[in-house]
């Protein structure tokens, strides 16, 4: 069997970190200064709902809960099994703690949220070691080259997908490395309710804290 480079597998594995979720650019403005007198429990509840929706992965619903209804993209396609496995493992890992009180600002309030979650970059780094090993193992299990290569002697997409699926399962079976980040969320009054502003900091969280 002709010896093949591992670069296609390594690039595919490394590329997972860039595909955590495609977040559209959020454009938001300001609104008039709200009254300082407010029920902070309402602010905490609005933030809790946003965090819960974010963890569910339903970004279409989440968009409607954010100020300006930003386009949050389509997220990870479920058909891309390896990416989907990593993304939903990340979502399942998310936990958070809200600060007890918010801080008034000219346009609303801010509230600190401490997030603990799986480190996606640690998983994709592990894949760069695991994937070549799984490729060699799976290649040895095949009885025909046609199960690995196409007519142009390139890896078959289904073989690459099988390698990444198996490698991802192995990577996710390991005890996860966790991140802890504290975000300062901004909330403003709109349409009679408190809404979280889609700041860059929030977008970073919604994309899995990748590329830090």
Predicted features, each with a name:
Residues 1-65, 109-113:
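Gram-positive cell-envelope targeting signals
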Residues 32-103, 122:
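Core segments of small alpha/beta cavity-forming domains
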Residues 57-61, 118-120, 193-195, 203:
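Primarily extracytoplasmic ectodomains and periplasmic/lumenal surface modules that are beta-strand-rich
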Residues 66-68, 100-102, 113-119, 198-202:
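A mature extracytoplasmic/lumenal domain signature
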Residues 80-84, 162-170:
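Short Pro/Gly-enriched beta-strand edge/turn motifs at strand-loop
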Residues 100-110, 187-193:
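A short, structured loop/turn motif at beta-sheet edges
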Residues 116-134:
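Short, cysteine-centered beta-strand-loop-beta hairpins and adjacent loop/turn segments enriched
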